[in-house]
Amino acid sequence: MTMKKSIIAFPRIGSNRELKFALEKYFRKEITEEELQTVAKEIRLENWKSQKEAGIDSPISNDFSFYDQTLDLSIALGAIPGSYKNLELSELDTLFALARGFQDEQNDVKARPMKKWFNTNYHYLVPEINKDTIIKANFSKLLNEYKEAKSAGFETRPTIIGPYTFLVLADYKSGATKDTVLSDVIVAFQTLLKELNQLGVEWLQIEEPALVLDQTEEEKKLFVSIYEELLKSKNNLNILLQTYFGDVRDSYKEIIKLDFDGIGLDFIEGRDSLALIQKYGFPKKKILFAGLVNGKNIWRNNYQKTLELLTALDEVADIVINTSCSLQHVPVTIKNETKLSKEILKHFSFATEKLNEIDEISDIYFNKNTSFLKKNVELFENERVRENSKLKQKLDKLTEKDFTRQPSLVERRASQSQSLNLPVLPTTTIGSFPQTAEVRKVRLQNKRGELRQADYDTFLEEKIKECLKLQEDIGLDVLVHGEFERNDMVEYFGEKLEGYVFTQKAWVQSYGTRCVKPPIVWTDVTRPEAMTVRWSAYAQSQTSKPVKGMLTGPVTILNWSFPREDISLKASTLQLALAVQEEVLDLEKAGIKIIQIDEAALREKLPLRKSDWYKEYLDWAIPAFRLVHSKVKPETQIHTHMCYSEFEDIIPSIDAMDADVISFEASRSELSIIDALKAHHFKTLVGPGVYDIHSPRIPSVKEIQNQLEKILDKLPIEQVWVNPDCGLKTRGNAETIPSLRHLVEATRVLRKEKVVYDK
């Protein structure tokens, strides 16, 4: 089959989040596994239909997952830690135990660690390799989904994460190394190739995004050794090596020498992809799958620029128009958006629309059909938005002084200690409290205009009072108002700022059942009025304990939005920083003594290659955070929070944010960050999360006590705060309340053991 139009993968949540809702019903035991599988099958069928109808030559199979594709591969290879095997659950329930943890009368196992998938807001479950790991091939999921598509009339290209990326991302325990399982992993993949040959499959797509990371010589040799051996088994099967999220500069010369039939390169984030081809050439007998349509943003493709790039690739004999990465990072379709005007929607392209863009670009380039080009050129010729001149003047006037808080961290600490009068090991939460069906219902009624604002405000006041009373009863030291007025930590602020537009159903998977609806930065961003002061001030008026003001930081707001492409990320972030700074100062004026500015997504846009970290990102992202709090009083304590990323290698930059307290996700990662904090002589006070809120299991007092003891073995008690690892919005009260009681009880035990007076 001749291919000209391709994608890497398609969203798997369903156009109306059908998978999320089915999974949640399954977890609540409201539907059977068979009913869950039926929903999954319907989503897959709809996805294949959409691709085929848009002219995609080879729709993708095995891009579906009930939770995470990396976890699927771990299971396919048999890389399942013994504690999960011993549960003796079904294969599907074992998968969910790995992802969510499992707790019953006889068993109690934690969920596997999650990490951000390269530089995205998607999270993967980290594979574990230990001395007891026995790799054994079981690719029934991939094979069954291929056969399912075939029986429905679709000849698909199965996709799978490759052995190199699997080995690079895995966590090695009890003395195990890559070499421990290398030969067995290769044999397992050889088994897969044999089975695909027997089925008559034409193409297999092997995803190796780890090739865009900095590679050591040892890693380069590992990659080559894997594929020199594996490709001997391909027989009649065509193998596509698919890369994304950057370029493969370290191993391009080796890649083009290997016996791949197709090579997928990213020309959106792959800064050097074109230069590599121009310098080293591209083999005439191989097909280039050119990632020209952005799989991570929602703006229309500029066909003229894409055609210029294709022209520069003229020497390549065989080209397929492809996405730059999986489309799972964008919403499914704009067809669900009925409230945005056509004038706005015409600038957007979600996953389904990107299929059409690929079809049109292909028609223009291969068939010289210029009708689509003319319309696209007109779209980009017209000015979309105008610059805010007042905002530009403010930004132009910024000096180094605006990015520096005085006095120093150590001097401020004394003022804050006196002002707040907190015990050693202060206890708090990260911000949000469980949002019940009632809260979501009332908030939606208000949004639709079905509830008077005064009645809604009264409802929120009651919920805040309940939340404060609960926290006081539990014994927490620093309280939060619960964030019941907020649907999402980014969308809420976007709605209060000028410059954003919002969708109804543009959902994107973050992990498992967790979906987010990123707002879209449409134009220059400003703050017309206070956003959070009303509720923070009310909460503080109801208690004598300090209540944290809760904000999302500028870097995270941008990283969890769909950013503009007509100005730089730095420019957008500084606009947001000025807006958040205004809010911080208003909270301080309202008597809020502790203000938390979450930067949960700080790591997300960090370039994947270390040589680009500072110039391309940290040199402006860290100052943007400092700009937000540079003008507050010494006695105002600034907190920030970060979650589910690897921070160990940027600890000095995090310290340079100059916050007074930083809380980290640490429970799933087994407190690995503590060693890095100690090694770098981290000065900021820290709250490493002592239990995992993304799992429904309830930690015991002893478990939290053990976590705290591990922390205090490495950090001085005066430096430590005690908190969960993230906000509690997605949990239920049934788990949250006992977990927090256990947290406070464990803290009090430690205070007594350390002979510290508990206030």
Swiss-Prot record:
It comes from the Bacteria. 5-methyltetrahydropteroyltri-L-glutamate binds at R17, E18, L19, K20, K116, R514, C515, W560, E604. The active site is at H694 (proton donor). Keywords: Amino-acid biosynthesis, Metal-binding, Methionine biosynthesis, Methyltransferase, Repeat, Transferase, Zinc. L-methionine binds at I430, G431, S432, E483, D598. Pathway: Amino-acid biosynthesis; L-methionine biosynthesis via de novo pathway; L-methionine from L-homocysteine (MetE route): step 1/1. Belongs to the vitamin-B12 independent methionine synthase family. This is 5-methyltetrahydropteroyltriglutamate--homocysteine methyltransferase. Binds 1 zinc ion per subunit. InterPro entries: Cbl-indep_Met_Synth_N, Cobalamin-indep_Met_synthase, Met_Synth_C/arc, UROD/MetE-like_sf. The gene is metE. Its cofactor is Zn(2+). One of its GO terms (molecular function) is 5-methyltetrahydropteroyltriglutamate-homocysteine S-methyltransferase activity. Catalyzes the transfer of a methyl group from 5-methyltetrahydrofolate to homocysteine resulting in methionine formation. Gene3D superfamilies: 3.20.20.210. L-homocysteine binds at I430, G431, S432, E483, D598. GO terms for biological process: methionine biosynthetic process; methylation. SUPFAM superfamilies: UROD/MetE-like. Zn(2+) binds at H641, C643, E665, C726. Its EC number is 2.1.1.14. It catalyses: 5-methyltetrahydropteroyltri-L-glutamate + L-homocysteine = tetrahydropteroyltri-L-glutamate + L-methionine.
